[in-house]
Structures are given as C-alpha cells and as structure tokens.
Regions:
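Short glycine/threonine-rich loop-to-helix capping motif typified by GTGT followed
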Residues: 2, 33-43, 85, 170-174
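C-terminal edge-of-domain segments
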Residues: 64-106
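A structural-propensity feature for long, helix-poor, extended segments
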Residues: 23-70
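Non-transmembrane, aqueous-exposed alpha-helical and coiled segments at domain scale
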Residues: 15-19, 23, 85
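Alpha-helical support elements that line or immediately flank enzyme active sites
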Residues: 2-16
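Short secondary-structure junctions
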Residues: 16, 67-71, 150-154
Length: 206
C-alpha cells in the first residue's frame, strides 16, 4: 500500500490544500477491484489523500480517520482504457461537489508509482523530482507565466489541449517558486500545481 499512499499524498500535494472529497476509480480489468481491500490499498489511497505519509503508522487507521474527519473518499471501478494492472484515476472534488481535477495513476511495485495524466495533459511524476505545472487558457495567462518563469531562470516545456496550454517546469529542490505560485488566481491562469519530492532519499554511508 506504500505506492498507493504516495499516489494519494502526491495528489494532495498537487491540489495544494486539504482534500475533503475524492473518488478513486479503478480500471475494471485491472487487479485493484478484487484486491484493494485485502492488500490495504484502500488504507493507502485514503491515507495519502488526507495527508498521511506512506511511512506513518497511522496509515492503517486512515479509513476511520477520514470518516471521523468527515472526509468522503469513495472507491469505484470503470473502464479507463487498460494500460496497467494497478491503474486508477483519482477525481478530486471541492467542498461544493464540483470536480477540481483528475490524475491517472499507476502503482508499479516496491512502493513506487507514476502519475501520467493531469486532467487531459500528459505528465510524468514519480515523486523523485520537483516540478510545477501551470495551465493557461488565454494569451494573457501565457504572457504572465513566461514572465514569472524567466524571472527564476526556469526551463520549461509546453503542450496544448483544447485551447489550454500546460507549462511543465522542472525545479531544483531549493529553487524559489513564489513568483510562480503567485500566478494562482491571475487572469488567464486556470491552475498552478506543484509536485514535491516525496520518495525516500537514500542515505549516504558516513
């Protein structure tokens, strides 16, 4: 369940605030629908989504903690277009019930994971590097984003889906991204989401 917990934790990281409602939708042809309770994936996903790290002993109580806190984490199955046995889409909802965003995820074994889609954009998150994602829906938003990115000397790549442009920006662990986070809520910016490093770092022998 460590991979599932990290998927949930990274999803919460991308959201940038507490998650009160989410659907975890399993690929119906994958292994999750028949194994997620027995293998503890329900505790993993729920714990991560409510902010419990994979290494935290509270993970085993995550489902009851979520219930006590009034959070609604629902498990479903659907056809997602089978790509991996441990494939799940997570839909995050605001308190008023409207969908905020979705991610497509794979738990790949050994506590490792991949997030391959953010809304309809193709991305690559595995928890080992820091990235920020800026989605612009107007030319004004694009101009604001590029000024902020140039200010911190960042490199970036872009992709366009349905009149929206996503900037994918790799960051160093110490790179200050306040000017990028300040884009939230600005005209033409539909979202700014950050992926932090969450995988355990191998300690060097002294």
């Amino acid at each position: 369940s460590a991979g599932c917990a990290r998927i949930g934790f990274m999803t919460r990281c991308l959201y940038g605030k507490d998650i009160t409602q989410a659907d975890v939708v399993f690929e119906e042809l994958g292994s999750y629908p028949s194994t997620y309770v027995g293998q503890g994936s329900n505790f993993g996903f729920t714990g991560g989504l409510i902010g419990i790290p994979a290494e935290d002993p509270r993970l085993k109580d995550a489902v009851s903690i979520a219930k006590e806190q009034g959070r609604k984490i629902v498990f479903k199955k659907a056809s997602l277009g089978f790509k991996h046995p441990n494939q799940a889409r997570i839909d995050v909802f605001a308190a008023d019930g409207h969908k905020e965003f979705s991610v497509m995820t794979y738990s790949i074994g050994g506590g490792m994971f991949q997030i391959t889609e953010l809304d309809e954009f193709q991305i690559a998150i595995d928890g080992s590097s820091r990235q920020v994602f800026i989605c612009c829906e107007t030319s004004e938003g694009i101009a604001l984003a590029e000024v902020a990115l140039e200010r911190i000397g960042a490199a970036w790549s872009t992709q366009r889906v349905k009149n929206r442009t996503l900037y994918t920006v790799p960051l160093t662990r110490t790179q200050n991204c306040d000017s990028i986070l300040a884009l939230r809520g600005q005209p033409g910016i539909s979202f700014v989401r950050i992926a932090e490093v969450i995988m355990p770092v191998a300690r060097k022998a002294v």
